[in-house]
Swiss-Prot record:
This is Chromosomal replication initiator protein DnaA. Residues 91-136 are annotated as: Domain II. Residues 1-91 are annotated as: Domain I, interacts with DnaA modulators. Residues 96-113 have a biased composition (Low complexity). HAMAP family: DnaA_bact (MF_00377). It comes from Alcanivorax borkumensis (strain ATCC 700651 / DSM 11573 / NCIMB 13689 / SK2).
Length: 474
C-alpha cells in the first residue's frame, strides 16, 4: 500500500515541480515499505542527494503524502542506498562481459597514462584497421576540482557528480548538457570521465567529438571494418560525445548512432552528450534521436553570473601564480560577461601585458590591455538594446517601460530590464533610472533586489531572466 502511495505522490510532485528539478532529485529516489506499511524508506544514490532532498523537498513530500493518506501516515526515512540487490555502480564499470552480442567486450583495455591538459581537447584521428587500442582522449586537467561552480552551472555540476558516483543510474542516462560556447560543458564531461577512471582505472571510458564518430564510421565503411566499428563503440563503459549538433543532416551517421545509443542503454552503459542548444531545437536531427536524448536528464548551462566570473578569474590567476586584486577581478568580470572562454582569454591578455611591461595589475593596466574588448562590449550591450529585447520578449512597447504605469504586466518587465541593465552595463544606478523615464536610483535598487528575490523563488521568472540574458550576451 505504501509503495502505491509513493507512486501517487510522484505523480503530484511531477506536476508541481519544474521537470529538471523533478528528474534530477525526485525521480532517482527508490522506495521500500516495511511489511506492516508503517515505515516508508526513500533511498537516494548518494549523500549529496540525501542532503539536498532533505533540505529542499522532504517537507513537501511529507505534506503530499499526508494529503493522500486517509489513515496514519507511514514514518518517512531518507537514506543512501538502493532497493536492488546490488548497487548499479558496482557492476556497470567493473570490466565484466555481457552475454549480449552488443555488450562490452570481455577484456577492457587498461586506462591510459595521465596526460597534461591540451589546448584542444578534441581527439586526434585513430585507425579502425586491425585491433584498435582503447584510448580515453580525456583531458586530465578538466576535473571537478578545477571546475568553478556558481548559480548558473550548479545543477549541471551536481548532475555530473551524480553520474560520476553512480554511472548509468535511473534518470541520469543519458546525461545531456546544453548551452552556448565556452560555458563549461566539455569541462564537466571530461570531469565525469576522469572521475570514473579514478574510481576504476579499468573502466573503458571514451571521449570524442561527434565529427570524430562520423569520420570513424566513414573510414570503417571504406575499409570494410564496420563490424569492428560497431563492436568498439558498443563495448565502452561510458561514451562521451561532444557537440552532437554536428550529427544534423548526416542521415547514415544518425542511423548508426541511434543503434549504438540503444545498445549502450540496454546494457547499462553510461552516455554523456553535449549540444550547443536544446536538442529539440536542432534542425536536421531525427525525431527519434531527439526523443531518446530526453530519456535521461537534460541540463542547461547558462552564462556565469558576476560572482562566478570573479571566482573563475581568481582561480585562473592563482593557477598562473599571478596576484589579481579583487577590484581588478570585478572590473574584468563586469565587462566580459558572455562565457568562460572569453573571460579566460581576457585574463591571459592582462597577464601577458603584465609580463611584457613588468607593471603591477591595476585598473589602468587592465583598461589598456583590454581596451578593444571593453569598447566592443560597450557597443554590443546598451540600455536601449536591453529595453528593446525585454519589450519584445514580454510583448509590450518600449514606451511602457518608460511610462509611470504600475500594472504587473508592465512593472515586472521594467524591473527585469533594470536588473539586466545593472548586470550587463557599466552604468550607475542613477543613470539607469534616468534611462527608465527619469526614475531615481532607489527605484532601480528596489527593482534589482526584487528580481533577485523572484528568481530564487519563482522558476518562471528565473527562466525568463536567463532567456533574456542568453539573448543579450550571445
Amino acid at each position: 500500500m505504501s509503495e502505491e502511495l509513493w507512486q501517487r505522490c510522484l505523480t503530484r510532485l511531477e506536476d508541481e515541480l519544474p521537470s529538471q528539478q523533478f528528474n534530477m532529485w525526485i525521480r532517482p529516489l527508490q522506495v521500500a515499505a516495511s511489511a506492516d506499511g508503517a515505515e516508508l524508506t526513500l533511498f537516494a544514490p548518494n549523500r549529496f542527494v540525501v542532503d539536498w532532498v532533505r533540505d529542499k523537498y522532504l517537507d513537501r513530500i511529507s505534506e503530499v503524502l499526508g494529503e493522500m493518506q486517509s489513515g496514519p501516515l507511514p514514518q518517512l526515512r531518507l537514506e543512501v542506498g538502493s532497493t536492488r540487490a546490488s548497487t548499479p555502480a558496482a557492476s556497470y564499470f567493473n570490466g565484466s562481459s555481457s552475454s549480449s552480442s552488443n555488450g562490452p567486450i570481455t577484456t577492457p583495455a587498461a586506462a591510459p597514462a595521465p596526460r597534461q591538459p591540451e589546448s584542444d581537447s578534441r581527439p586526434q584521428p585513430t585507425s579502425l584497421g586491425g585491433a584498435r587500442k582503447h584510448r580515453s582522449n580525456l583531458n586530465t586537467g578538466f576535473t571537478f576540482s578545477t571546475f568553478v561552480e556558481g548559480k548558473s552551472n550548479r545543477m549541471a555540476a551536481a548532475a555530473a557528480q551524480q553520474v560520476a558516483e553512480n554511472p548509468a543510474s535511473h534518470g541520469y542516462n543519458p546525461l545531456l548538457l546544453y548551452g552556448g560556447v565556452g560555458l563549461g560543458k566539455t569541462h564537466l564531461m571530461h570531469a565525469v570521465g576522469n572521475e570514473l577512471l579514478r574510481r576504476n582505472p579499468n573502466a573503458k571510458v571514451v571521449y570524442l567529438h561527434s565529427e570524430r564518430f562520423v569520420a570513424d564510421m566513414i573510414s570503417a565503411l571504406r575499409n570494410k571494418t564496420i563490424n569492428e566499428f560497431k563492436r568498439f563503440y558498443r563495448s565502452v563503459d561510458a561514451l562521451l560525445i561532444d557537440d552532437i549538433q554536428f550529427f544534423a543532416g548526416k542521415e547514415q551517421s544518425q542511423e548508426e548512432f541511434f543503434h549504438t545509443f540503444n545498445a549502450l542503454l540496454e546494457n547499462g552503459q553510461q552516455i554523456i552528450l553535449t549540444c550547443d542548444k536544446f536538442p529539440k531545437e536542432v534542425d536536421g536531427l531525427e525525431e527519434r534521436l531527439k526523443s531518446r536524448f530526453g530519456w535521461g536528464l537534460s541540463q542547461p548551462m547558462e552564462p556565469p553570473e558576476l560572482e562566478t566570473r570573479v571566482a573563475i578569474l581568481k582561480k585562473k590567476a592563482e593557477e598562473a601564480k599571478v596576484d589579481l586584486p579583487n577590484d581588478a577581478a570585478f572590473f574584468i568580470a563586469q565587462r566580459i560577461r558572455s562565457n568562460v572562454r572569453e573571460l579566460e582569454g581576457a585574463l591571459r591578455r592582462v597577464i601577458a601585458h603584465v609580463r611584457f611591461t613588468g607593471a603591477q595589475i591595476d585598473i589602468g593596466l587592465i583598461k589598456e590591455a583590454l581596451k578593444d574588448l571593453i569598447a566592443l562590449q560597450a557597443r554590443q550591450i546598451s540600455i536601449d538594446n536591453i529595453q528593446r529585447i525585454v519589450a519584445e520578449y514580454y510583448k509590450i512597447k518600449i514606451n511602457d517601460l518608460l511610462s509611470p504605469r504600475r500594472t504587473r504586466s508592465v512593472a515586472r518587465p521594467r524591473q527585469v530590464a533594470m536588473a539586466l541593465s545593472k548586470e550587463l552595463t557599466s552604468h550607475s544606478l542613477p543613470e539607469i533610472g534616468e534611462n527608465f523615464g527619469g526614475r531615481d536610483h532607489t527605484t532601480v535598487l528596489h527593482a534589482c533586489r526584487k528580481v533577485l528575490e523572484l528568481r530564487e523563488s519563482n522558476p518562471e521568472i528565473e527562466e525568463d531572466y536567463l532567456n533574456l540574458l542568453r539573448t543579450l550576451t550571445s
